[in-house]
Swiss-Prot record:
The lineage of its organism: Eukaryota, Viridiplantae, Streptophyta, Embryophyta, Tracheophyta. It comes from Arabidopsis thaliana. Induction: Up-regulated by wounding and herbivory. This is Protein TIFY 3A. Repressor of jasmonate (JA) responses. Targets MYC2, MYC3 and MYC4 that are JA-dependent transcription activators. Pfam families: Jas_motif, tify.
Amino acid sequence: MAEVNGDFPVPSFADGTGSVSAGLDLLVERSIHEARSTEPDASTQLTIIFGGSCRVFNGVPAQKVQEIIRIAFAGKQTKNVTGINPALNRALSFSTVADLPIARRRSLQRFLEKRRDRSTKPDGSMILPSQLTIIFGGSFSVFDGIPAEKVQEILHIAAAAKATETINLTSINPALKRAISFSNASTVACVSTADVPIARRRSLQRFFEKRRHRFVHTKPYSATTSEADKNETSPIVT
């Protein structure tokens, strides 16, 4: 029975109160807790990026991640980019040109900038080291110059320590991106003309017919000719 409070009726429940029963509250709270417990914990997810590929391991303990980071730190070979090419050091060690005339100083500055740009271009003697990125628990670590053998060892350790199936992502390879974009372009080019308006579709069909007609007749040593062309080229007998 509903009780009237002023002008608005207040519903009464089985327990005699004007609110939802405690049993229903516990049921809703338990359902929400179960739904949250089924979601993957992002804090135990380990992501390793190396050589254009990305691999995700779920359920890796923090102690195992610390071991992986120690292995990566011991195997890194960080180099100073400035010290790789001696020509770059010579270009940076030039004395100041503030005491030269303005026109000559600007010309010399442009010359030094061009020389520095040429020196910093990558060549056979300036190879950038491989980079390993480890993401875990909302933080990431980047290591330069990690050998591929050391990365394979790290991947084996992470795979052995994972609690669930590994996710292999190959979405950051430039060659794969180009292949996907080319595939998408080909798919768009092969879309049917059924969704084109009627007038435009007919015009497009005539265009393709004329194009095929020109291709057949301009192709050298073509043995296929249409009946209409034979009738047009045959002499008229009166």
